[in-house]
């Protein structure tokens, strides 16, 4: 049966990538259908009950700056908020929030269900409608065909998903859910490169069986931060509660090493490669055999939940072994496991087969986002869902496209890494992956991206006005401070002396004074004659960072300008690299396979040398492809 409701975009999957994708295309005005195997699991946190962290928090802020739902949802559902690296520079500070799982899912559903242009239908997708190498719709398990101009696949770990607990394996997309084997087989029949990856989750513990008195207490920040740029004064956080910290020990490690042959990872049952930066407890004990203990974050799953998430104990060991090593840990001596930990392996498709828009190179109008591209994490998934669906929506009746770059966002870094380098293990974001960290901060994500969000129609009128007011306040106040001078012999200078390490010897602007490490905006406000009445902390923060890091920021902007030339030089999709004399066979093969869209993208493909880029540039200039 064909249901032709005139959909512009179909999003397959209701996880974190799917939610951002469905929301984005609908906000732009595209008639959107979200297809999910179970409406009740939309927005579900399948693994850890937390959002953000180093690198990841930057992604959440950027999604929010583009009008996404993740930051607002966690503001409604977060039960502990912390700023990580708060004593370090602004480039590496990151927000992390512990979530109440039920409140988070409720918040996501509230935001999605009230979104115009968005329909939701419950059924698994088994097949795609593909005509002349162009996707035209999706076919569900019950035989219903939904036609659309664009399809975005955000299927998580469900493609050929297999769950392992010890040597017991069964098919599953996650615990309690069936995998999407029919869709996996269909995708394998298309000209995409496919491989397997693995991830895992720890056992869940009944909090009533845990002795918290012997653990370290970890409180959230006070005042409680907000994730969304648009939440303060509108959203009230739930009650805030602490997390706890405990540690493994030598006994824990012995139990694990004595039973490694029973682990699905170490017995050879799992083919997929696991995440390097979120390893199982088995991997930690083997790879870091010299460490006497490993830190475990004991995280509540919700205000009214009795389940605890022991972050750091992901495992594929048998249930009996899980019980034994859990009870060897301080505070867990009488722990009762409510759900066993498990590993899951699944299909992913080589992201080098994608364009920067996340449209596939082989099938037109088909987009991939999330774990299907080899990433791990809610935040990475949400970022991809956003970009894929933006491009699906804006290209319906035109050849428009938009994608972030390494110079303007961590989302740009994420996508560029994936499409140029690919991945052999689950990819997660870190601040160290970005070249321009000082520019790509959490605090200025809106200043970097919200203008584009306004242009694309992604922000509500209210959020748009909030952003414009903030941006104008920053511009106006910086201009005022750059044009307000204080002479060394004035009363203002004498009033400032109590704050200065060295007396003023020449006339300075307020902006230059703010560059001094001992001066901040609040101290300048104490000089009554200056009439600095600004009270908006977010605006003040931007003014201070602009002043104190101005030299570094200018340097990074110059670096960006140098590389921008290559980024602007487009390579036609049908470009014949064999015509370029002097390219090695290796370079020729890689360029032909990956089909980079710009010279900048080509330059970042592993194995492509500066000499090869030079030859390519000269040829393209001679033949008129670039000026």
Swiss-Prot record:
Top-level taxon in the UniProt lineage: Bacteria
Coiled-coil ranges (or none): none
Signal peptide: none
Compartment(s) where it occurs, according to its Swiss-Prot or TrEMBL record: Cytoplasm
InterPro entries xrefs: FAD/NAD-bd_sf, GIDA_C_N, MnmG, MnmG-rel, MnmG-rel_CS, MnmG_C, MnmG_C_subdom, MnmG_C_subdom_sf
Main localization, broad class: cytoplasm
Recorded GO CC terms: cytosol
UniProt binding sites for FAD: 13-18, 125, 180, 371
Binding, NAD(+): 274-288
Gene3D superfamilies according to UniProt: FAD/NAD(P)-binding domain, GidA associated domain, C-terminal subdomain, tRNA uridine 5-carboxymethylaminomethyl modification enzyme MnmG/GidA
Record carries keyword Ribosomal protein: no
One of the GO biological process terms: tRNA wobble uridine modification
Cofactor needs: FAD
Function, in words: NAD-binding protein involved in the addition of a carboxymethylaminomethyl (cmnm) group at the wobble position (U34) of certain tRNAs, forming tRNA-cmnm(5)s(2)U34.
HAMAP family: MnmG_GidA (MF_00129)
Assembly notes: Homodimer. Heterotetramer of two MnmE and two MnmG subunits.
The protein's name in its UniProt record: tRNA uridine 5-carboxymethylaminomethyl modification enzyme MnmG
